[in-house]
Amino acid sequence: MHPLRGSICLNCLSKWSPWRRMSTRNTTEPPLSKKQQKRKMKEETITQYAGDNSKRADRVYAWGCASTGAIGIPSYLKPEKGQHPIYTVRQPARVKFMDRANLKVTKVGCGYGFTVYVTISFRGNRLYGTGINTDSQIGYHEFPRNTGRVLDYVIEPTLIDLPLDHRDTTNITQVACGRGHTLILTDKEGVFTLGNNAYGQCGRPIVEGEVYGQNPRVNKMKDIPDNIAKIVCGHDHSFLLTTDGEVYSCGLGCDGQTGLGHYRTTSQPTKIKGGIEGVKITQIASTGDCVLALSEEGDVFAWGNSEYNQLSIVTEQTQINIPKYLPLKHCGKIIKAASAGSKCAIVNTKGELFVWGYGILGKGPKLESATEPEMIPPPLFGCNELEPDVSVIDVVCGLHHFVALTNNGSVYTWGKDKHGCLGLGIQRDQYFPLKVSIPAETHSIQCGVDHTVVLCKSFC
């Protein structure tokens, strides 16, 4: 056989290509014009369609600050020879560890420079953490084993061992992360906590001079209700939400963020009363020190920090230590809420999103302060004549940025682009929602202070 015989790419048949000269030398056919080449390529194109029974794969994407290890891709911080470290990821990057380990991620918690995953595999329900571990917020990791070398930074998802009594039958249902602490909710064995407890945010007594780094201790909350349904971490405080809609809190209270009627620290989870007493609460939102609570009826209650007029609708004070009802009737029935460092966002049953507070709110550079909720125009989230049914179904936030999810699986971000946390591929702040390019359909979103993680399904 002639060494050059075989298939030749039609794109290579350019005027000056040696392949063209070889191909025309041994044939009587005239050379193809560009139009004929394109037509032939189109005829030879093979299109593969996904079958009706094809299974869509789970995907995890992350972006933002990679220097802490929170992204969970080790090659960014330990590159191969000839490559440079990557400290900022400005576009969605696929976290392939889950695929290699055959893990399905069900829940995610994002803290300040660390990420915790709840996973399911043939081994059962497990917890993995990656990122900053200076306060043991993602567990005790000795590497290599039996060397006494405990990791302050973990650059790839690593198993977090919990002292479960019934490891094979107890399931982890949720995880929440604060500045330096983590809460883990189980279906049969209560709530476990890891990390910094300087203000009682882990729900146990404060120990003066306690060293949190390289600490193998895993705490189980005591004297709490048996029917905890959700857990939430703020800056240095925590919330427990029961199936009855009652809310318990502990931790730092200097801005009234615990909602217990005082400004002291509290190490024992205590029931919050005030405006939410007797009201069934379904969601708590608190990334910073301002807290929003949603009721089953779609009403909004709030307490905590109001230095940026987040709560100026009901008070002129800069802090509120007890829940108050926010009269937001013009916004409709609220189903989702997010509370950042200086601004808030809510979503109603129509899929409309409202913002208020101070900073980059999402309605352009001219609006940096609002004392009452203002609606971001729906077309900014992809609602238009071609897709009139697109609506927002969820919103979360870091301290300075928002992330919204629409009912067609698209993700939009806006705010300060700290360490690439917006995922837009450019280094600049974003003053209105812009769609993030993700090669999959997103169904869950989570934010840390400077990174973002989304759970997705492949398109086919």
Go through each PLM region and give its residues.
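Conserved core positions of repeat-based scaffolds
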Residues: 62, 114-117, 129, 181-184, ...
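Beta-propeller domains
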Residues: 56-95, 120-153, 205-210
